[in-house]
Each structure stands twice: as C-alpha cells, then as structure tokens.
C-alpha cells in the first residue's frame, strides 16, 4: 500500500455491538450448526460524512482456528452516514464449535476520498448451557 492509500482511523467514527443472540432453531448446514445473530450500530460522531465500502471479520473458534471474511459493503448496502447519524443492522455468524470470538473493521471513504477505518469491538459467541 502506498502512502497515498493510507487508511486513517477517523476520530468519532465508532462501532457498538448492541446484542448477540444464539439462534438454536435456525436452519444451518451440518458442518456449522451454531447460528449467532449480532446487532451492530456504526455511529458517526465525526465532522465528516462517511460511506462504508467494505468489512473484514476475523472469527476465532475455541480450537484456535481462524476464519477471515472480507466483503463489499454491509448487508448488501454501502451506507452513507452523515455526521451525528448512525447505521444499525443485524447479520449472523455460523460456527462449527460451541464458542468463538469475532472482531474486525469497516472500511469507508470520506467526501475527500480519504480511506477511513473503524474497528468492530471483539465479542464472544457461546452456546448457552453446554460443556
């Protein structure tokens, strides 16, 4: 990455993980039977409008196996978040183990074309009541 492509953490752009819910009745593939729905809000308390262009998730299961998921946008959208506004959504992770942690980042761009990043706080996904 060249210096011109430097990605900045924009003060005031932050993410909250509002809720994580285990969905025991979700239809899942046999190799990933545990579904966790997460609810996230991206808050723009900065002075610049930000358009979220992509995301990166790093999910580590209880055995130490790491899965990296990268993609364009957020739930099929490229949300434009004006100063003082927020964008909330929910999605899910499918796990092959009973416990994992997830964290990551969103990549965006400001009106001047500068690339910005905000981190997704680490959160746990644990199947309730199991050994």
Predicted regions, residues:
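Short, solvent-exposed loop/turn segments enriched in Ser/Thr/Gly
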Residues: 32-39, 101-103
């Amino acid at each position: 990455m060249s210096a011109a492509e430097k990605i900045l953490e924009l003060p005031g752009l932050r993410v909250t993980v509002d809720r994580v819910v285990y969905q025991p009745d979700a239809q899942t593939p046999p190799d990933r039977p545990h579904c966790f729905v997460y609810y996230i809000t991206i808050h723009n308390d900065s002075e610049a409008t930000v358009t979220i262009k992509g995301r990166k998730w790093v999910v580590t299961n209880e055995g130490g196996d790491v899965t990296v998921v990268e993609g364009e946008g957020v739930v099929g959208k490229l949300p434009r978040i004006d100063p003082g506004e927020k964008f909330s959504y929910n999605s899910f992770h499918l796990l092959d183990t009973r416990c994992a942690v997830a964290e990551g980042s969103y990549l965006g761009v400001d009106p001047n074309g500068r690339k910005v990043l905000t981190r997704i706080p680490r959160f746990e996904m644990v199947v309730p009541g199991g050994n």
